[in-house]
């Protein structure tokens, strides 16, 4: 591992010039990445020829090329002492005026100076040189937005500066895409900027080549850490890179946006959490949430904005009372409200199963103090005013979290009997909680600069130096141990399982590779994780050198070896299905047995469907040959109808359940039964009289006094394109032109009639709507009340709630004027928690 304190190797001016002499790419290139225009970075500079770019500041021994030569008057001896010092200062000032910093870098350099007021000018010049090299080699490259590509590395570096990262990391941020996207190589980089910057850029370049996704396994993580994260700053740069990409995602196609957002939510946000970088984590989560679930996101944003004024008023009262108590106790503290993050609110609704109001109305405040002693003193002061809620106190100072997060958590019954959450910690703890591992370099720079704002957990009288305090940071030592323990990936993965769930175990293969398995996994799960054939042929196992039964439970760090059979007929046992834990093993075992009897299972499944349909007098032939079953199979994620039949035959899905779904797709039991008549050829001489007071609002062109009815499968309303179909004994059934049943009906074109809308005051139409909302108590009651207020007659209502606390409701009601439907939908959308509402029809999906 390179020493972080190692000074940067400054390249000589002629070396940088030699680098500039290399031919830069001539043709403009549009990178296929997630980059769009930056939001917080300055505009890209105007391109300059290499020879016009500012020169690095000359060494003290050099005379600047354009600096004035100060000479003593003739006949007088040269003055010394203060006069010479004044002249030298003026000469240096002339150099600075002659070589100002690139104005594009001023916002970045302002942040850098704020982090370290005593930073040397030579270091700032090195950062400027890194920008010059990056701008030169990215010249001509464009982002998806059309902006110069250099705007991206500049924005990434600004994020790194805001985190307080050191100059080497800032230079690596500016140069992080040069090696991958240009002809500027690692040797050029090492010559111009030294080993540390080269190591960081190389690590980020390799990290970019790791492909994450559904197939990402624990060994991929191990390789990433061993080969690419020899220095933790590599991961910090990558997080800043991903954050800027997420901020500028709008120029990509929707499909790619969702892919990147899902990857961010599953990998990068948890990685930031593991590194303790909560500010990055929260923003990544909210950005990904907005892309993946835009309607839910918008609804939570609306709810937050709606409740913010009242919540802020209550928060001000609580904050003021806490400040008064702490002031009376002579505890110097900063008391602020804790922000609520949209994805965090959504997650709490899912995990805790609570309504939005419960979560958002729970006020949280943060108390920051100087020392650990003050933390506990502040806790006592708060508990003296308000009663604590039993079981809600947590001491993360004495027992830090896995990422060394430290704080005191408590919940009290505040003013008005409302619960209030408090976090009490020192300023240093807060910086680590916000910036995580990045806080190490910020702390280090402040310590070196002797900044007065640096606070320590120990009293000033303790006599400890700043270096001692750095050594006391157990959280930092634990995280930096990655670099020393890469040969032991199991231990690393225990502290950095960012892309896998918590309920897992990590075991080793005989070759030292890491396999991630569900908690409670067995050697059989391990065998199938290695390879399907290894799993099928497994006959025994050895764990940590000891023979064990195949159903034994594996623990973290176990070394697992399995024995396989070479016999031609070797295969899995059905008994394994009783103890395997991984979906992969279970699916592979079932697939092995399913292969032998798939045809048999398909026939059994089809027979089961037919029997279930007969019980409900459904049109078997039409449904089995139509699109309804195909659509249902795809919705249930089966590749085709045969796969659905096989699943039914093998007992994975029940036939009555499938038939019920089909009936719902056709518009309900009545509509499905109605279709039986439509599938039978018409016979003359039979008919029914039209029902009185039931004007459908449709007439058949060229035909009078014929019974017309609106199909319940697609519930057409005036304005919808429609067709008529002659049924036996039921007159003409009117369907939407895009109804899923039209394809099967059109096989008999002689029975298709032209119809048109002619609604009257007595016409009544069926409308079905679907309401999607964040689940809460009284949701159904509130929606039905709004529908009643809109004077619609509700005929049926059904509600389902998913695991992620999304309530999906379907209402069928009668309306006299479908033009009023827009007002109805708008009113329902105004119900708290509702983020989408739309009319439901059985329209065919666009091909």
UniProtKB/Swiss-Prot annotation:
Residues 149-246 form the HD domain. Keywords: ATP-binding, GTP-binding, Kinase, Nucleotide-binding, Stress response, Transferase. Pfam families: ACT_4, HD_4, RelA_AH_RIS, RelA_SpoT, TGS. Pathway: Purine metabolism; ppGpp biosynthesis; ppGpp from GTP: step 1/2. The keyword Kinase applies. Residues 768-842 form the ACT domain. It catalyses: GTP + ATP = guanosine 3'-diphosphate 5'-triphosphate + AMP. One of its GO terms (biological process) is guanosine tetraphosphate biosynthetic process. InterPro entries: ACT-like_dom_sf, ACT_dom, Beta-grasp_dom_sf, HD/PDEase_dom, HD_domain, NT_sf, RelA/Spo_fam, RelA/SpoT_AH_RIS. Residues 1-85, 671-694 are annotated as: Disordered. Induction: By amino acid starvation. Activation through the binding of uncharged tRNA in the acceptor sites of translating ribosomes. Residues 503-564 form the TGS domain. The keyword ATP-binding applies. GO terms for molecular function: ATP binding; GTP binding; GTP diphosphokinase activity; kinase activity. Belongs to the RelA/SpoT family. This is GTP pyrophosphokinase.
């Amino acid at each position: 591992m390179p020493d972080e304190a190692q000074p940067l190797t400054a390249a000589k001016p002629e070396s940088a010039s030699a680098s500039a002499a290399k031919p830069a790419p001539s043709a403009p290139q549009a990178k296929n990445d997630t980059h769009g225009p930056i939001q917080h970075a300055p505009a890209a500079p105007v391109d300059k020829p290499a020879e016009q770019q500012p020169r690095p500041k000359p060494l003290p021994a050099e005379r600047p090329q354009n600096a004035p030569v100060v000479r003593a008057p003739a006949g007088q001896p040269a003055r010394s002492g203060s006069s010479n010092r004044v002249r030298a200062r003026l000469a240096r000032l002339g150099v600075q005026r002659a070589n100002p910093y690139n104005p594009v870098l001023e916002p970045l350099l302002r942040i850098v100076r704020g982090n370290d007021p005593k930073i040397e000018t030579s270091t700032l010049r090195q950062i400027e040189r890194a920008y010059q090299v990056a701008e030169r080699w990215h010249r001509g490259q464009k982002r998806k937005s059309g902006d110069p590509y250099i705007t991206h590395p500049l924005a990434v570096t600004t994020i790194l500066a805001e985190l307080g990262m050191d100059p080497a990391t800032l230079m690596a941020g500016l140069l992080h895409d040069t090696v991958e996207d240009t002809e500027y190589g690692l040797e050029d980089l090492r010559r111009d900027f030294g080993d540390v910057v080269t190591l960081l850029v190389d690590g980020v370049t390799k990290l970019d080549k790791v492909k994450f996704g559904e197939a990402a396994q624990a060994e991929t993580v191990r390789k990433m850490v061993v080969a690419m994260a020899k220095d933790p700053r590599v991961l910090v740069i990558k997080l800043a890179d991903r954050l800027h990409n997420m901020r500028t995602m709008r120029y990509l196609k929707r499909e790619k946006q969702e892919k990147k957002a899902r990857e961010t939510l599953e990998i990068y946000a948890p990685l930031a959490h593991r590194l303790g970088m909560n500010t990055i984590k929260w923003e990544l989560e909210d950005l990904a949430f907005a892309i993946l679930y835009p309607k839910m996101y918008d609804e939570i944003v609306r709810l937050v904005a709606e409740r913010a004024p009242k919540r802020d008023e209550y928060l001000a009262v609580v904050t003021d009372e806490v400040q008064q108590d702490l002031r009376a106790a002579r505890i110097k503290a900063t008391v602020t409200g804790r922000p609520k993050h949209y994805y965090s609110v959504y997650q709490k609704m899912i995990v805790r199963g609570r309504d939005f109001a419960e979560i958002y109305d729970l006020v949280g405040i943060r108390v920051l103090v100087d020392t650990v002693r003050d933390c506990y003193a502040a806790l006592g002061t708060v508990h003296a005013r308000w009663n604590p809620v039993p079981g809600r106190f947590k001491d993360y100072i004495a027992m830090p979290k896995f990422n060394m997060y430290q704080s005191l958590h408590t919940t009290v019954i505040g003013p008005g009997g409302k619960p209030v959450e408090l976090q009490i910690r020192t300023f240093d703890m807060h910086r680590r909680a916000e910036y995580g591992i990045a806080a190490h370099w910020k702390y280090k720079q402040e310590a070196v600069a002797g900044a007065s704002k640096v606070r320590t957990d120990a009293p000033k009288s303790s006599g400890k130096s700043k270096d001692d305090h750095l050594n006391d940071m157990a959280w930092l030592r634990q995280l930096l141990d990655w670099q020393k323990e890469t040969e032991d990936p199991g231990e690393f993965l225990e502290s950095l399982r960012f892309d896998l769930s918590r309920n897992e175990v990590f075991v080793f293969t005989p070759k030292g590779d890491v396999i991630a398995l569900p908690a409670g996994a067995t050697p059989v799960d391990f065998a199938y994780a290695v390879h399907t054939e290894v799993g099928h042929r497994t006959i025994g196992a050895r764990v940590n050198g000891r023979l064990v039964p195949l159903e034994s439970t594996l623990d973290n760090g176990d070394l697992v070896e399995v024995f396989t059979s070479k016999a031609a007929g070797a295969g899995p046992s059905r008994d394994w299905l009783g103890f395997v834990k991984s979906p992969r093993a279970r699916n592979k075992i079932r697939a092995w047995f399913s292969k032998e009897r798939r045809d048999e299972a398909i026939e059994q499944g089809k027979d089961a469907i037919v029997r279930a349909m007969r019980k409900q007098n459904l049109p078997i032939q039409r449904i089995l040959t139509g699109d309804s079953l195909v659509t249902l199979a795809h919705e249930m994620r089966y590749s085709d109808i045969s796969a659905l039949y096989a699943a039914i035959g093998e007992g994975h899905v029940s036939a009555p359940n499938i038939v019920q779904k089909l009936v719902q797709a056709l518009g309900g039991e009545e509509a499905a039964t109605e279709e039986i008549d439509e599938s039978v050829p018409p016979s003359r001489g039979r008919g029914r009289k039209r029902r009185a007071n039931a004007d459908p609002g449709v007439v058949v062109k060229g035909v009078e006094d014929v019974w017309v009815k609106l199909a319940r499968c697609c519930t057409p309303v005036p304005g919808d394109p429609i067709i008529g179909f002659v049924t036996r004994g039921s007159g003409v059934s009117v369907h939407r032109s895009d109804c899923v049943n039209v394809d099967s009906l059109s096989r008999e074109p002689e029975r298709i009639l032209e119809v048109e809308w002619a609604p009257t005051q007595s016409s009544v139409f069926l409308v079905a709507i679907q309401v999607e909302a964040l689940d809460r108590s009284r949701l159904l009651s509130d929606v039905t009340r709004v529908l009643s207020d809109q004077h619609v007659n509700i005929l049926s209502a059904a509600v389902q709630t998913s695991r992620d606390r999304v309530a999906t409701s379907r209402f069928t009601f009668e309306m006299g004027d479908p033009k009023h439907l827009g007002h109805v939908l708008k009113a329902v959308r105004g119900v708290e928690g509702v983020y989408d509402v739309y009319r439901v029809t059985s329209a065919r999906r666009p091909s």
